[in-house]
């Protein structure tokens, strides 16, 4: 993929202009509402967001002390669907899946620390690494007393979810794989590489101009465009430099070399993938993904050749939004079959 300085100027200019629009529809008071709350929180969501995200998030103290917001919807049970998002999304990504499943299945959907409605500590106060993310999920599952979890993973949620699953295969039931990876790979889109640029350039793009979360609201769609409120929903938690700390952290945590701090963690996850061979799996893949393209889809087919797989050639990275009912219904049927 060729990428020129003109591309970067165009991209940054669009981001700068958008900062005055939907990208700056602020989180207004939500962070204050989460901090220090032990169970249900927050209450400060605006009406337009509650219409799309009609849930009452809960709050959990992670091992490093940062507060994690998470959804816990559906009947109380020690069996749950665990839905793990990636970057730059949050549990908002799973809103329609949760609404479909929650009448009969418990659904737990965390916002990773620094993302969504979770606390956003500085990089000095939280270790924004894959290992820390996995530890947070382990602690959340243990705190809820879950004895069996069915995984739904997307983007970074794949590495995090399979990190959990390969460490605790006895707890894992069915697995839904959505445009993700859980193994090292040297491929990286030029636009994401730009967001990792040294000398503070990458941070300026991601945190100063919202040049990762905002472009995703159009680059991650192909079949249709997100509505104005859907865009606002995705961007709601990331309204300023400080609130984009984890968006930048995830980009920098992509292990592109063996010397990277998270390479060993990801390689260990890859080695553990055979432990989950017998688990029923459903692969749902958007073929118009600028990041996790069909190379990754084919890798998953090689790793788990017995998995049920559906490829949607005209669907983008935000496969749940772009694929709509067609994708969501397949997830619902697959997971409800776990109930016998």
Describe the function of each predicted region.
Residues 33-59, 66-68, 73-75, 80, ...:
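Flexible "cap/lid" subdomain of the alpha/beta-hydrolase fold that forms the substrate-access gate
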């Amino acid at each position: 993929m060729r990428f020129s300085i003109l591309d970067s100027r165009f991209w940054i200019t669009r981001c700068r202009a958008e900062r005055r629009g939907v990208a700056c529809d602020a989180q207004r008071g939500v962070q204050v509402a989460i901090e220090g709350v032990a169970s249900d929180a927050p209450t400060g969501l605006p009406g337009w967001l509650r219409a799309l995200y009609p849930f009452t998030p809960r709050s959990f103290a992670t091992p490093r002390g940062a507060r994690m917001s998470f959804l816990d919807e559906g009947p109380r049970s020690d069996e749950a669907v665990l839905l793990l998002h990636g970057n730059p999304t949050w549990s908002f990504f799973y809103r329609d899946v949760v609404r479909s499943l929650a009448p009969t299945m418990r659904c737990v959907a965390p916002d990773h620390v620094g993302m969504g409605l979770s606390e956003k500590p500085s990089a000095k106060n939280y270790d924004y690494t894959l290992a820390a993310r996995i530890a947070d999920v382990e602690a959340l599952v243990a705190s809820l007393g879950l004895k069996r979890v069915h995984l739904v993973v997307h983007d970074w949620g794949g590495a995090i979810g399979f990190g959990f699953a390969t460490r605790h295969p006895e707890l894992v039931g069915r697995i839904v794989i959505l445009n993700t990876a859980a193994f090292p790979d040297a491929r990286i889109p030029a636009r994401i590489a730009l967001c990792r640029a040294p000398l503070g350039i990458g941070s300026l793009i991601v945190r100063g101009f919202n040049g990762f979360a905002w472009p995703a609201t159009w680059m991650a769609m192909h079949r249709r465009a997100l509505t104005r409120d859907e865009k606002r929903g995705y961007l709601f938690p990331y309204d300023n430099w400080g609130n984009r700390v984890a968006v930048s952290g995830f980009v920098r945590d992509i292990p592109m070399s063996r010397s990277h701090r998270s390479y060993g963690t990801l390689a260990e996850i890859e080695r553990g993938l055979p432990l989950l061979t017998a688990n029923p799996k459903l692969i749902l893949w958007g073929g118009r993904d600028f990041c996790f393209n069909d190379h990754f889809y084919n890798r998953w087919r090689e790793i788990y050749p017995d998995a049920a797989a559906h490829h949607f050639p005209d669907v983008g990275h935000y496969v749940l939004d772009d694929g709509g009912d067609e994708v969501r219904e397949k997830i619902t049927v697959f997971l409800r079959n776990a109930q016998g």
